Structure formats: structure tokens, C-alpha cells
Amino acid sequence: MTIEYRKAEAEDAQMLINIYNAAFYSDYKRFGACPGYGKTLGMMEASIREHPKYIILCDRKPVGCVSCKMLETSAYEITCLCIVPEYQGKGLGTQAVRFVKALYEDWLKITLVTPVEKKENVKFYTEKCGFRIVSAETDGNVELARFVAER
């Protein structure tokens, strides 16, 4: 299994919509809403311009995406990490977090949020990626945990 990352371009918008919709469909069904699900082409094109996105390729097949934004010097936020369901549980997410840490060499702090109810995400970020929960937030009717990794 060969994993590669390619920076997304505007022409990747529809492909990314398909990846996001596949990856976030269960969240949409579970919570009734999900910011990553159901994006329009215009929304995804704007998102690609605003936040660098990297397409996760497994044996050259697009299977996920990771995106990050700079909050301040040496502080970043992972704004999206998604893998299509049939490729989840194969280590791609862990490798994507490592990719982000290597890409932003100056990082001292990386944050992200995920729904508290998604125990598998909480376990993934804390046990496999070295994050810890620092606070809770609410987005509509969804309680979110804010995670941080520091070095």
C-alpha cells in the first residue's frame, strides 16, 4: 500500500466533494448536520483557495483529504481529516497527521475539533496521534471536543 499526498487544485473540487460526502455521510445521518457533508462546487472551490488541502492517495487512488490552516506563528489547526469508509482503519489517518507535522516543520501547537460522541475519533486522536482534549465547544446541537498537540 503506497500512500502519497497531492496538493488540491480548483479542478479537484468535485472529487473532494465526493470524498467528503462518502466520509461524512454517517455523521450527517447521526447528527442531522455536518459541515463537511453536502458542500456545493462553489463552496469547495472557495475552501480549496482558503485552506490548503492535500488529497490522500492510496496506490494512486484518491481516498481522503487533510487540510490545515495557520492560526498564528507555529500554531496550526487541522480543519479536515477525512478518509472514505472503505479505507478507514488502515493507518491512513495516522499517516496524514504525521504528514501535517512534517509539512509544517515549525509547528509548536496543532489543534482540531471533533464531535465528543465520536468515541472512535477521540480514541484515534488521543491514543494514536498524541493529542489531548483541552476544552469543549458546541456547534448547533453537536458537542465538540477541542484537541491540542504541542511540542
Residue ranges and their predicted role:
Residues I17, N21-M44:
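Conserved GNAT-fold acetyl-CoA-binding loop/helix
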Residues V97, Y104-V116:
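Conserved GNAT acetyl-CoA-binding A-motif
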Residues T111-V122, T138-V142:
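Conserved beta-strand-loop-alpha-helix junction that forms the acyl-donor binding cleft
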